[in-house]
Structure formats: structure tokens, C-alpha cells
Regions:
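Contiguous surface segments at macromolecular interaction interfaces
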Residues: 1-51, 123-184
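Structured alpha/beta reader/binder surfaces that contact nucleic acids or chromatin modification marks
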Residues: 50, 54-139
């Protein structure tokens, strides 16, 4: 946990609308995972390469990102680049994650454990059943809760919008209160 700032809450889609969330979270049992089970969230943009290459080098990353993923709309380019950068370097050990899967009808809530991981060397070890081979940027997570879409808490927490990675407008205290108090 970072001693210099309070934990944040992040939203992460793993694949389109969370379609690959199950592939990264079945190593220790069936999906959805039980509380206190380890798993992963992952994002794409494999064309930028291993983000460890860019640690403390945002300008070099941004330049290479614009080459790998050109877009005439500077706002779109910046938004996409910042999602990858935030996933790799702004998310810290101890931050929280909300990760919905429309396909599975479940929303997972967890806490990040550790730093950014690159899966470029052997992409079959973490999620052998994934169908998108470009999901190579990883973060390890300790799952705290799995909330089904028929639970009232699902609607309250499934507000991460359309971005793959986003900082959510909810405090960690409120998030923990929601998941520990059962259905609201």
C-alpha cells in the first residue's frame, strides 16, 4: 500500500464489456471467484510493448503510443494512451478495482496486489483460455466480492462508463461499505 496517498477506486473492463474477465480468474476455481481469491485484470494495446520499458518515461511512451496507435483526434489518442499509462503506473498496490462482465452478469470487486506485470514472454501461462491474445498488460488482484447482476449493489457499482480503465467517483470506504453490507 502506498503511504503517500489514500487508496483510489478504479474501473477496469477486461475485454469488450468484460468478456475476458472469467479467463483471467479461473486458475483457482470456478468463475466467479470466491472472496479472498487471487486473480487478474488485463488490458490490450499490445502494440505499445512491455510497459516496463517506459517506467518514468511518459514522453517516450506517449510518442511511441501515437506511432503504434495513430489517431487524428488528439483527445482520443490522449485518452487511450492515458488508460494504458494509468493501468501500468498510476494504479498502486492497495488501490481497489471494480471489474464488470456483462457477458457473465457479474461484477468483481477487489484490491490490487503488487505492481504492473507484463505477460509478453509467455502469454499462455496466466489465462490459457483467453480468446484475445493482445491482453498482455496485467495487474494481480485479490478479489473481495462477486456481485451478480440481480443484486441491487450491481447497479450501484456498475457505473464505470465505456473506458477500459477509469478512476471511479467513489471512495474506498463507500465501496467497502457497499460490498460488506449485502444487498442495499
Amino acid at each position: 500500500m502506498n503511504k503517500y496517498r489514500q487508496p483510489k477506486v478504479w474501473g477496469v473492463f477486461v475485454g469488450e464489456r468484460g468478456s475476458q474477465l472469467a479467463a483471467f480468474n479461473t486458475e483457482y476455481g470456478p468463475f466467479p471467484p470466491k472472496p479472498n481469491t487471487d486473480g487478474y485484470v488485463a488490458i490490450g494495446w499490445a502494440g505499445i510493448g512491455d510497459m516496463l520499458t517506459y517506467k518514468n518515461r511518459y514522453n517516450a511512451f506517449r510518442e511511441n503510443f501515437s506511432i503504434a496507435y495513430p489517431d487524428d483526434n488528439e483527445r482520443v489518442l490522449s485518452t487511450q494512451a492515458n488508460m494504458v499509462w494509468n493501468f501500468s503506473y498510476e494504479i498502486l498496490d492497495g488501490d481497489y478495482v471494480v471489474s464488470p462482465s456483462s457477458e457473465s452478469g457479474v461484477l468483481l470487486v477487489g484490491q490490487f496486489t503488487g505492481e504492473y506485470l507484463s505477460d509478453f514472454n509467455n502469454h499462455s501461462t496466466v489465462a490459457p483460455s483467453k480468446t484475445r491474445k493482445d491482453l498482455l498488460h496485467l495487474r494481480k488482484v485479490r478479489w473481495l466480492a462477486a456481485i451478480q447482476d440481480d443484486d441491487n449493489r450491481y447497479g450501484e457499482l456498475n457505473r464505470i462508463g465505456q473506458l477500459t480503465v477509469s478512476s471511479l467517483n467513489i471512495t474506498p470506504e463507500r465501496l467497502v461499505e457497499i460490498i460488506t453490507n449485502g444487498e442495499q
